[in-house]
């Protein structure tokens, strides 16, 4: 890795919102998030991480068993689970029904079926590691 004087990895903006998820199957999670519209930012020097973007937000997937922890107690807690209890990743989509169909085809749990909530149409599901995801399709100015 190349670091600047500020300690930032070369080529990686310092002021981006980044969300990191520790996952049990890096390839499966990576593929799923790509199909949900995320873009891949290759980082060949970090084999146990996958960097993705969605707009200006970064999602960093790390292998739960290969990526380091900052202390032994956090590692123990992360591996015992449940993963991310209380955490919800919200992903906008242009086609909620197609995203819901993808979730079902993948055999992933849906915890709230699609419903209208006034400002958007939403549904909730769990990703392969049990992280809760809310998908939202915003209403157009005409209300559809």
Predicted features along the sequence, with ranges:
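A short, aromatic/hydrophobic, helix- or strand-capping loop or linear motif
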Residues: 42-48, 115-116
